[in-house]
Regions:
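N-terminal Rossmann-like NAD(P)+-binding domain of SDR-like oxidoreductases, especially those catalyzing
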Residues: 1-143
Length: 143
């Protein structure tokens, strides 16, 4: 099985890459940056900006599955002061990667989202119950 992990330089992507390699998958890791704390276990690691269509075509070429974790993100200070930039960049990354996967005949595509899609009233309760996908609706944007 040939697998692409986008966001492979990040915390979750790094651990997912290790897991998939341990399961016998050939893994291509892609990230805007090299992993900061430890070398990637990916068989191939490409440093690509997935906001650009051509790079997503390169990233998704010759793989069977995509685990899509890449996004423009940062700490709360960055997020709070760069909202439009984050929406634009993450939108481009998501749309380009999904379409490139389709064009390149990828069989499976896993999209990883964020707990931030859930309304804050579902996150603030001390009564912690597992959230379901449909709990994100109706949408309740903060700003």
């Amino acid at each position: 099985m040939r697998v692409l992990v986008t966001g492979a330089g990040g915390f979750i992507g790094h651990h997912l890459t290790n897991f998939l390699v341990g399961r016998g998958c050939w893994v291509r890791g892609v990230d805007l940056h090299q992993p900061e704390y430890a070398a990637s276990a990916a068989h191939e690691f490409l440093q690509l900006d997935l906001r650009h269509w051509e790079n997503t075509l390169i990233a998704t070429r010759d793989v069977d599955q995509v685990y899509h974790l890449a996004a423009n993100m940062g700490g709360i200070g960055f997020i709070s002061s760069h909202k439009a930039e984050i929406v634009r960049d993450s939108g481009l990354i998501n749309l380009h990667t999904l379409e490139a996967a389709r064009v390149n005949g990828v069989q499976r595509f896993l999209f990883s989202s964020s707990a931030c899609v859930y309304p804050s009233y579902r996150q603030d309760s001390p009564d912690v119950t597992p959230l379901k996908e449909e709990d994100a609706l109706p949408a309740d944007p903060e700003d």
